Amino acid sequence: DQPRSRGLGDVYKRQEQDGNQPFLMCCHFKATHEPYDYPIRMEHLYDGVTFPEPENLLDWGPETNGRSFKGQTLEELERRWRIASQDPDKWWCRYPGLPFSTEGMQRTAARRASYQKFIRDYLRCGATVDDNIGKLLNALDEMNIADNTIVIYVSDQGYFLGEHGFFDKRMFYEESARMPFVIRYPKKVPAGKRLDDLILNVDFAPTLAEFAGVKMENVQGDSFVSNLEGNTPTDWRKEIYYRYWTNHAIRPAHFAIRSDRYKLIFYYARNLDMTDTENFDFTPSWDFYDLQNDPHENHNAYNDPKYAPVIKQMKKDLLRLRKETGDTDEKYPEMQELLEKYYNK
């Protein structure tokens, strides 16, 4: 509630001073981030509701789908709830709805119970954000500036809501990698349009600059104003590059490439000179997904021979993107050796 009230106060004040001057307001909501703490007015929202489960909620890791890593599962979140239930002062944050424990439950029942608590807390936070965004939009209507104001709702990443049994983010699965981006600008953007082009967050700044009539040079991203207007350039990117540096056993360091249909990930699992890492035994490995035939990424198809030509080309494209972005790890001889050793494994 606080980001909305402060943001509205600034807008009202600016409009009273000079309603003809342009303004920029950034209103940052953190509510759906752990610990998923919602305001008191939402504490009974969804009481008694049993939420539908993701089809792969009971994904138990490499044994289930052949992926290369365990992942940050709901069992870890339940462990945090349990510690905080016993002594809240021993944990870094305050979770709502405690005490909570799955002690004594079978593995499947415990995960399902943890999911129901997690998604209920999360959606209560989401409802709070939604409520406040509605108030912001209503304020623009009241000031008669809605049609001349660009409104964007965006996040810094996606989030796992029980898919693969996960919570949190970080990994290059669709739920985590896909960022919400919703824009309202009646003058330029048709309502109800959905864009399937590959967009990166480095594209946001040049896009906003073009809307504002500002020319930007020497930037990494590309404006997608034309895409939003229904005129995607013929030379628009066909692949995107991703890297996650922090290295832990449940979420090893990796880099990846994604096209409109395929995804290839290399888990190198080395600390390099990063902080917040740990040492563990892990053999570097590849994961590959066909997003058309396996949209929920339930089967690592890296060793399926029918995909060998696709994987071979994607590895070449991955090296090209690493070079284009300047992310070649030249200062890490260890990484050069790893790539050479595992490139064709």
Feature names for model-found ranges:
Residues D1-Y12:
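Single conserved hydrophobic/aromatic residue that forms the stacking wall/gate
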Residues C27, Y46, N227-L228, I257, ...:
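A generic structural signal for nonpolar/aromatic side chains embedded in well-ordered alpha-helices
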Residues R14-Q21, C26-I199, E210-V219, D273-T275, ...:
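Active-site-proximal cap/lid insertion segments
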Residues P22, Q157-E163, V202-A205, E210-D287, ...:
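C-terminal cap/loop subdomain of S1 sulfatases and analogous C-terminal strand-loop tails that border
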Residues M314-L318:
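Short amphipathic alpha-helical coiled-coil/interface segments
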